[in-house]
């Protein structure tokens, strides 16, 4: 009997040891770092299961929040879509996209900071790394970048199932929207991005240019000699006159009415514009800032529907 009791005791101790070991290994695995490559090509070591993520730009946070991810810090922005405003309203702000507050970021004790490839975020890499906090920079310049971001943020949030469902929904809508885009129609398009300092033409390396190409447009900016791998190149009236686009679409930084009026005044006053087909046929459109000034993320299909309507008069 004593031997039996002793045997049972040994088994209990062994099982307890096993479960404690398994629990410890699981905890170690959860806290272990994984190596990923961000949009700048940098190797970043991030927690396998980050729990306290701070976002520095609205586009990345929108995708993360759309699959149910919970952030501990967010940028100050007026560009959030209505469907996530409620879920993020109580998240502490860490400053505008162009002026992130490092002290505020660190006060939130993040185990991961997510930004985009702009100087104001790149310059945070060293001070964050010195504090033991990884910085992951994620650029969204195309439809494919949106899908990849959904996958990546699904892993970060531990919500792979929700991410897969969101991706499948977008891919289904994309297929339905593009299935009747026929070769041969190929409207010639010019997309102008206006800022307080300059007017630029969007190439296929920009988000708007990528969407236009997927909808069958011929983007005249891609024919420019100085395009290389640039997302935007300076607006050249001689080039526009030579290429003679059928459609002009305008994007203004922050939806600025002043910039839009400056663009339209230029079209009225510069005689070169008067012979451009898009102007002669009244096919100059302003793209909504909420979908084009800031990357629309999971609302990309809404942006494509508007472009398709302007290009073909249909958005099925």
What label would you give each PLM region?
Residues 2-59, 160-192, 252, 306-316:
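Bacterial Sec-exported substrate-binding components of ABC uptake systems
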Residues 28, 147, 155, 164, ...:
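Structured C-terminal subdomain patch of bacterial secreted/periplasmic proteins
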Residues 39-41, 92-103, 226-237:
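Short helix-initiation/N-cap motifs at beta->coil->alpha
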Residues 44-46, 61-66, 80-83, 197-203, ...:
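Short, solvent-exposed loop/turn elements at domain surfaces
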Residues 47-50, 57-68, 102, 106, ...:
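Extracytoplasmic/secreted envelope proteins and their assembly/folding machinery
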Residues 55-108, 112-118, 217-220:
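A short, structured surface patch at a secondary-structure boundary
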Residues 82, 209-229:
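His/Asp/Glu-enriched short active-site or ligand-binding loop at hydrolase and phosphoryl-transfer sites
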Residues 120-124, 136-152, 186-211, 258:
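Extracytoplasmic ligand-binding site segments that recognize negatively charged/polar headgroups
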């Amino acid at each position: 009997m004593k031997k039996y009791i002793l045997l049972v005791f040994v088994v209990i101790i062994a099982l307890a040891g096993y479960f404690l070991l398994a629990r410890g290994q699981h905890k170690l695995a959860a806290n272990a770092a994984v190596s990923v490559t961000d949009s700048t090509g940098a190797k970043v070591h991030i927690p396998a299961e980050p729990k306290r993520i701070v976002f520095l730009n609205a586009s990345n946070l929108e995708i993360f929040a759309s699959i149910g991810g919970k952030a501990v810090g967010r940028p100050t922005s007026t560009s959030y879509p209505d469907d996530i405003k409620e879920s993020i309203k109580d998240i502490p702000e860490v400053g505008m996209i162009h002026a992130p507050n490092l002290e505020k970021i660190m006060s939130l004790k993040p185990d991961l900071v997510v930004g985009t490839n702009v100087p104001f975020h790149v310059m945070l890499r060293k001070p964050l790394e010195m504090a033991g906090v990884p910085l992951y920079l994620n650029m969204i310049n195309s439809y494919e970048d949106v899908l990849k971001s959904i996958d990546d943020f699904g892993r970060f949030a531990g919500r792979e199932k929700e991410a897969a469902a969101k991706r499948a929904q977008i891919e289904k809508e994309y297929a339905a929207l593009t299935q009747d885009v026929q070769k041969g129609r190929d409207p010639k398009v010019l997309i102008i991005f206006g800022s307080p300092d300059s007017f630029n033409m969007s190439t296929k390396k920009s988000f708007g240019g990528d969407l236009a190409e997927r909808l069958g447009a011929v983007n005249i900016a891609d024919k420019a000699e100085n395009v290389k791998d640039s997302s935007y190149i300076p607006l050249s009236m001689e080039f526009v006159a030579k290429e003679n686009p059928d459609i002009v679409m305008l994007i203004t930084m922050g939806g600025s009415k002043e910039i839009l009026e400056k663009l339209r005044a230029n079209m009225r006053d510069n005689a070169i514009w008067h012979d451009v087909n898009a102007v002669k046929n009244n096919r100059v459109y302003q793209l909504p800032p909420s979908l084009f000034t800031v990357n629309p993320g999971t609302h990309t299909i809404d942006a494509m529907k508007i472009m398709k309507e302007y290009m073909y008069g249909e958005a099925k």
